Each structure stands twice: as structure tokens, then as C-alpha cells.
Amino acid sequence: MRALGLDLGTKTLGVAISLSGIWANPYKTIFYDGTSYEPLIKELKTIITQNNIDTLVLGLPKNMDNSLGFAAERSLKFKNALEENFNLEVVLID
């Protein structure tokens, strides 16, 4: 498994790569304006192609009571954008 770990913030996307499926190493931070995912998708296309990625792992930050707040809703919207642009499995993890 070659996976990208994604941590979506309000202005940045943290990216880590796992080439073994066991360990992940920091790769880069991508900056965006917080309103459009297009710059992120464009950059991710390059990273995915260059590293033969087959799985995307996206952080889903839940509240302490396991409910979904604003940050989780933002992650779910980004998950939809990833699924629309890539034919890859997108796994959510808290």
C-alpha cells in the first residue's frame, strides 16, 4: 500500500507519505486560501502520480463527544472533492 496522509486545516494541507503502509513520513505542507480546493487537487495530482499512490487517508477531527463539528464538515467536503477528482480509496480517520 502506498498511501498519502492528509491533514486539512483552514489555510494549509499537511501531507505525509507511507510507502510501506506501516510508517508515514512528513512530505510537505500545501498552502491555500481556504475557499477553494482546486490548488490542493492540482498539487495532489502531481504528488499522487510521482509516488504511485493508491490510497488517501484523510483526518476527520471529531469532537470529544464523537460528534462532527465545523472541522469535520470541512474534511467531509474535501473527501467529496478527492473522490470526484481521483479514482482512489479515501479513508477517514479520527
Question: Model features per residue range: what roles?
Answer:
Residues D7:
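Conserved catalytic-loop position in the HRD/HxD motif
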